[in-house]
């Protein structure tokens, strides 16, 4: 990867004059000078205990391994909707993707193999060490994927308008400040860049399936992984996204079958869902798209098969 890829700074940030940085960048820096964070200490403790188990396909993260069967094509196909590039072997060549809360790199690796230049960040150092160790066995991944220990708000202070896409998969239900989190995602994206989120709706059915069944009865997820009060509906999430300058382009329901350990697209978002939003181009912005094509206005919702809409 490019040696100039941003890495989160561990030293105090020097705030340069607003005339040099721009109003939005200065706003972000002022925000975090007040020690605002999206990292929840309690959530850190949960995942610290599991940091060595990311690559056990039959272990605690088995559901995330199988989720790649849906989320990787979803990300790939939505990005390629607006791209005129054709590279059969590496369809995401030329795309710069930030994977927030990357854990052990379960999503970074397949995106890197598709040709994307991927930066995976996680506030837990143990997760990053696990990701780097697994990456080290594949020369292709060492070129395509870079990992660093930091939170999204730290990246936002030094990587304004850097990425074509930001991915937050099974992350937003664990953050302490969703509004700040989405604002930081907007900050690091190029104009017309894509934000991909997979998460859990806050419904009685999601409580029954994601907590009672998955955590306590079937034990396919460690007990205490989720808190129902932190789940968020697509409508609530869209409100946050709209206020941060995003346009929601697709919302698709997903369902996990614990008996077979597999995921499928379904026609409603009552439990899990995947969302694609695009950062609106502001007046004076240069398009961040590599091809200059205008972004489509058609939105797909709760599709049983997203490829029908893509």
Predicted features along the sequence, with ranges:
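N-terminal, positively charged/glycine-rich alpha-helical extensions of SAM-dependent methyltransferases
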Residues: 20-61, 65, 69, 310
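Conserved alpha-helix/loop element of class I SAM-dependent methyltransferases that forms part
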Residues: 66-93
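Acceptor-substrate binding/catalytic loop of class I
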Residues: 199, 218-236
């Amino acid at each position: 990867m490019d040696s100039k890829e941003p890495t989160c700074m561990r030293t105090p940030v020097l705030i340069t004059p607003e005339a040099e940085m721009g109003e939005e960048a200065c706003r972000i820096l002022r925000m975090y000078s007040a020690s605002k964070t999206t990292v929840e200490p309690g959530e850190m403790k949960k995942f610290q205990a599991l940091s060595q188990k990311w690559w056990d396909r039959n272990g605690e993260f088995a559901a995330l391994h199988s989720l790649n069967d849906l989320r990787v094509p979803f990300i790939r196909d939505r990005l390629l909707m607006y791209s005129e590039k054709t590279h059969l072997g590496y369809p995401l060549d030329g795309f710069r993707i930030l994977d927030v809360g990357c854990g052990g790199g379960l999503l970074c690796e397949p995106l890197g193999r598709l040709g994307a230049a991927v930066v995976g960040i996680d506030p837990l150092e143990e997760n990053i060490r696990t990701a780097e160790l697994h990456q080290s066995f594949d020369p292709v991944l060492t070129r395509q994927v870079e990992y660093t220990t930091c939170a999204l708000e730290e990246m936002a202070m030094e990587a304004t308008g850097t990425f074509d896409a930001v991915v937050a998969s099974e992350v937003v239900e664990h953050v302490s400040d969703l509004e700040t989190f989405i604002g930081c995602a907007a900050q690091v994206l190029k104009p017309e860049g894509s934000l991909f989120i997979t998460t859990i709706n806050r419904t009685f059915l999601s409580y029954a399936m994601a907590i009672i069944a998955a955590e306590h009865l079937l034990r396919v997820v460690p007990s205490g992984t989720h808190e129902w009060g932190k789940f968020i509906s697509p409508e609530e999430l869209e409100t946050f996204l709209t206020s941060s300058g995003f346009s929601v382009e697709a919302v698709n329901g997903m369902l996990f079958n614990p008996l077979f350990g597999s995921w499928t697209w379904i026609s409603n978002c009552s439990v899990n869902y995947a969302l694609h939003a695009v950062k609106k181009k502001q007046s004076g912005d240069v398009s961040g798209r590599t091809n200059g094509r205008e972004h489509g206005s058609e939105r797909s919702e709760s599709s049983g098969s997203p490829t029908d809409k893509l």
